Amino acid sequence: RKNHLVAFASRRERCFMPELNLLATLLVVALLVLWNLDFLATLLTLKNLKPELPEEFRGVWDDEKYLKSQSYEKAQAQFGIVSSISSLTILLAFWFFGGFGWVDGLVSELGFGKVGTGLSFIGLVYLGFWLSSLPFDLYHTFVLEERFGFNKTTVKTYIIDQIKSHLLTAILGGGIVALILWIFDSVP
């Protein structure tokens, strides 16, 4: 029992003090570079929005529809910035405060074997990030899209779509990940 507690305490210390080895540093840098490129592209999109209908579209679109499309594009871009800042912050906080190590310690205690532990780890991380993005998804679907008249989704349809999506992810993604984990475990 004492050895079990020492092992748990040691694993717990590692969870909350992640080391930034070369690979982890490269991953964080790549993540930040990609986020900044996406952010820059969004800013360029916002900068290039024009309040007047271009001459080329006169007679094809009316001014009201054009202004609505520009307002929608602006709202989408602004929402995307807020959403991506939130996602990036949650991911980096989870990483730097040892969230991945904590989840690993949690699922390792369950005794599911290597493949089951790997699937449990990925499933819990997926669940956590889905839950953290859920408020943004709900706002996007039921507030932002509704404001511009694009939302045809009912709450019931939304829930059914979410269930279908997660079932497909679990079956297809889980099957592929299980196969990869099994191959890694089987190859000497």
What residue spans do the PLM features occupy?
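Hydrophobic or amphipathic, alpha-helical segments that drive membrane association/targeting
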Residues: 17-188
